[in-house]
Amino acid sequence: MNANDNKQKILEAVDAGFDAQLATTRDFVAIPSTRGAEGPCQDMIGDLLRERGYEVDDWHIDVEDLKDLRGFGPIEHDFSRARTVVGTYRPQNNAGKSLILQGHCDVVPVGPLDMWENPPFSPVIKDGRMYGRGACDMKSGTIGALYALDAIKAAGLRPTARIHFQSVIEEESTGVGALSTLQRGYRADACFIPEPTNGKMIRSQVGVIWFRLKVRGFPVHVFEAGSGANAIMAAYHLIHSLQKLEAEWNERAQRDHHFGAVEHPINFNPGIIKGGDWASSVPAWCDVDCRIAVLPGWSVADAQSEIIACVSAAARDHRFLSNNPPQVEWSGFLSEGYELKDSAAPEAAFGKAFAAVYGGGGAVPERAFTALTDTRFYGLNYNIPSLCFGASGEAMHGFNEYVDLESLRKTTKATALFIAEWCGVEQV
């Protein structure tokens, strides 16, 4: 059987298994796997891998093992149940190139339930879309990669290289799930992460810094509010100054060879605000959790220094904060940006797969991504070229999140053909 016959059989196998793939995806999306509650998802992945005969490594993550590694971000919540699950396929004939397939099972909070058309963890298929929290980001991609492997087997083939299928947590907040796989010793010739990229390869992505502003005020009864100091209002003063820093960084970004053409690639977001104890008391405290991006090549340490300098300068210009300076705490991501390069071989292999599914000459569309993915750990820490390509969808981190099912079918096909091309296959 020639290579074209193999391709056709794999494509047909994806189609034949697509209903089962959607059923598994729906079950996966139905698990509420917000931060700290990912265990049932990891249980499901472990069971799916064992059913398929993979060698399964399921371990609890020890933060002490990771805290000195490049890209580690502070963990602030209970991490005692944090787990990583890796399924390994070992070939009988080791003739191809090894591969890591990775997906994350953690999802972000859903927000007010009354703003969803359907309950976020009761996935619905309608008009060619699957709706639900995590349906797009990125549970459909994770299950799609698993069914891509299934399609190769269903086609009567088996890969001729080692494959690690990795389900990680913390992608949405620190990335230490992916970091834990590298600390554990998992390596390969390439990595592929099927995040929802709208059918484009991520060429360059920002890094992200999470930090918390801790502002103190002076509480008094509201009838004499002028004699107190309102910590919430003072926090807004700092936010306005950080918006100016955001503007400065976006001006700097115009000189970047990938992000120069992207409108507003650096996004500052005050995402959580807490403060005060009583509506009739001038608030004595306010905490603001913030996120800001940095470009590839920018130093995280230098960016941290600029953030601190910005906050300090704003405090000096404030009546109360000048004598009661706010604190800046690092509360999650301390992540560098990543540019995919030195990756000609896996990109050529994926280009063949892309051409077979999408048509054209194998020129894969690219994007500069104003968020981040776990690819950075593989590329920056261990020089493992890490490709990121996946389906289309909308409303990630918002209401009524969905993945487009036809795009998911195509990306599953492209993933399966890429595995076959990169790892090699032989008849069973």
Predicted regions and their residues:
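Metal-dependent amide/peptide-bond hydrolase catalytic core
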Residues: 1-9, 79, 203, 212-428
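Acidic/His- and Gly-rich active-site-bordering loop/insert found
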Residues: 2-130, 159
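Short, P/G- and charge-enriched loop/turn segments at secondary-structure junctions
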Residues: 70-77, 199-200, 256-258
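Short beta-strand segments
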Residues: 102-103, 167, 192-195, 214-216, ...
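Acidic-glycine-rich active-site phosphate/pyrophosphate-binding loop
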Residues: 110-125, 203-214, 352-353, 387
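A short glycine/serine-rich beta->alpha loop
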Residues: 127-136, 220-222, 403
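Acidic/histidine-rich catalytic neighborhood of metal-dependent amide-processing enzymes
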Residues: 130, 138-210, 423, 427-428
